[in-house]
């Protein structure tokens, strides 16, 4: 009741709710492809690699979206370059590049005069989101979802069978980097909601939950987006009522939903699989 009254009275809470739900939905969409491609570590890498861009934008007085997106794309390209031009495997290249970017970000933060805004970027503070940031998040979400819908068949084929995708004449490498671009945009849009540290959880956890419940990609995307939005709403509620960190609250809610599915999913749930074993 107190939360609903706050929504009626305070514009900052309205903006926080809209932004959180938007991030939850778009994270579920892009996270579904990340899960299917086994690229969870890449999501973590890009979320950390944007830190120097955020720090530079802050020190130069620019919108952090610009710096974060630039460094996120640079990290994705750097990982691909190291992987392709050396014997280094993909997971090793990811570890090297994202660690270097994150370390650079920490050094740049030490030169900043104030760490307050940067702290919010690290850990999220959606209750302080500005109207411009809210609209930027909405625009990014619309662009990402529209592009996913436009290239849905290409992403579908290349995610399940890259070899067959190449046989059909699809540019698998282009689709990979294109997906990395979309992942970077989603990561940047989620910074103020859950922060750099926790953004990978919102990308992965709702999608992983949906993965336990269905074998169909289109249904998985819808479920992941729904779980992301629900996690955002419930997490924001607890954040507002109990004065908790908004990003952490959302991630914990998403994790609880995951474990419910992990236990009770009709086909993949732990309890149901144990029950089938007993019957057999």
UniProtKB/Swiss-Prot annotation:
Name of the molecule in the record: Manganese transport system membrane protein MntC
Organism in which the protein naturally occurs: Listeria monocytogenes serovar 1/2a (strain ATCC BAA-679 / EGD-e)
Compartment(s) where it occurs, according to its Swiss-Prot or TrEMBL record: Cell membrane
Membrane-spanning residues: 16-36, 41-61, 62-82, 92-112, 137-157, 168-188, 193-213, 221-241, 244-264
Domain of life assignment: Bacteria
Keywords: Cell membrane, Ion transport, Membrane, Transmembrane, Transmembrane helix, Transport
Name of the gene this protein is made from: mntC
Functional description taken from the UniProt entry: This protein is probably a component of a manganese permease, a binding protein-dependent, ATP-driven transport system.
This protein's record includes keyword Transmembrane: yes
CDD domains (alphabetical): TM_ABC_iron-siderophores_like
InterPro entries: ABC_BtuC-like, ABC_TroCD
One GO term of the biological process aspect: monoatomic ion transport
One Gene Ontology term, aspect cellular component: plasma membrane
Disulfide bonds: none
Family: Belongs to the ABC-3 integral membrane protein family.
């Amino acid at each position: 009741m107190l939360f609903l009254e706050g929504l009626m009275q305070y514009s900052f809470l309205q903006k926080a709710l809209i932004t959180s739900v938007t991030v939850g939905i778009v994270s579920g969409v892009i996270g579904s492809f990340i899960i299917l491609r086994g690229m969870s570590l890449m999501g973590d890498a890009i979320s950390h690699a944007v830190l120097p861009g955020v720090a530079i934008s802050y020190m130069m007085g620019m919108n952090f979206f610009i710096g974060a997106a630039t460094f996120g794309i640079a990290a994705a390209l750097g990982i691909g370059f190291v992987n392709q031009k050396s014997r280094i495997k993909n997971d090793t290249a990811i570890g090297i590049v994202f660690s270097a970017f994150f370390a650079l970000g920490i050094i740049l933060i030490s030169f900043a005069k104030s760490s307050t805004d940067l702290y919010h970027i690290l850990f999220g503070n959606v209750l302080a989101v500005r109207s411009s940031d809210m609209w930027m998040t909405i625009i990014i979400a619309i662009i990402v979802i529209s592009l996913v819908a436009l290239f849905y068949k290409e992403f579908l084929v290349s995610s399940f069978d890259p070899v067959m995708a190449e046989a059909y004449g699809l540019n698998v490498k282009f689709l990979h980097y294109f997906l990395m671009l979309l992942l970077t945009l989603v990561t940047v849009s989620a910074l103020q909601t859950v922060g750099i540290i926790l953004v990978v959880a919102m990308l992965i956890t709702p999608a992983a939950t949906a993965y336990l419940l269905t074998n169909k990609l289109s249904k998985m995307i819808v479920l992941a987006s729904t779980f992301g939005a629900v996690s955002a709403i419930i997490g924001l509620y607890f954040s507002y009522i109990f004065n908790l960190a908004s990003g952490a609250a959302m991630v914990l809610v998403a994790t609880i939903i995951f474990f419910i599915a992990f236990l009770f999913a009709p086909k993949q749930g732990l309890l149901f699989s144990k029950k089938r074993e007993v019957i057999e």
